[in-house]
């Protein structure tokens, strides 16, 4: 992991995107990155954009996930402790919470920025309507919504179909996609089916239903195109 991060930095990559539950175990990605930051990149902090998120399950109980003010700010404090930082550059609401008023969730992001624990506020995986509402709430609070992180790949273009990109353009909000390789499908990992040791076989982040006959045909065609170059 250290070699990957340092090689990326040496090649000009300065944005490192994390979340409280990245692991396993939860928190380990932040903790490991924090150790590498202290040992190898401490003198380069002002060159780096470091982001983290909260929204998915992190600890037991009603305040261990989703979008309550209590959870988001407690999680951010824990993330900063694991990273060994006073602030992150971007703090995201990792997913929309149907059980918490959006005003509360965006208010927590506003507090994170106003308190100096984050420089900018972001959201992830919000649909177009909720994105527009979130941007309006933050605008009224005086903390602009900087960025949205949706899933996006050649096989998953929902942000085009559902006009999320149009909403972001209207609101002046940036976009940075996650899973650009479609959770591994846009590699050669699944060309011959589902390997026994793969995430799809283990029922993790890549659902087997994504590997439809149509997508298999697309993958085979893309693989042939790649090998012809």
Please give the residue ranges for each predicted region.
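Short, acidic/polar
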Residues: 1-8, 66-84, 102-104, 131-135
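N-terminal binding-site loop/beta-alpha segment at the start of enzyme catalytic domains
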Residues: 1-48, 114
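Glycine-centered flexible beta-alpha turn that most often forms the glycine-rich phosphate-binding loop
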Residues: 16, 88, 121
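A short, structured active-site edge motif that brings together acidic residues
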Residues: 45-58, 149-152
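Active-site mouth loops of central-metabolism enzymes
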Residues: 57-73, 94-100
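Active-site groove signature of glycoside hydrolases
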Residues: 80-100
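Beta/alpha (TIM)-barrel catalytic core signal, keyed to glycine-rich beta->alpha loops juxtaposed to Asp/Glu
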Residues: 96-229
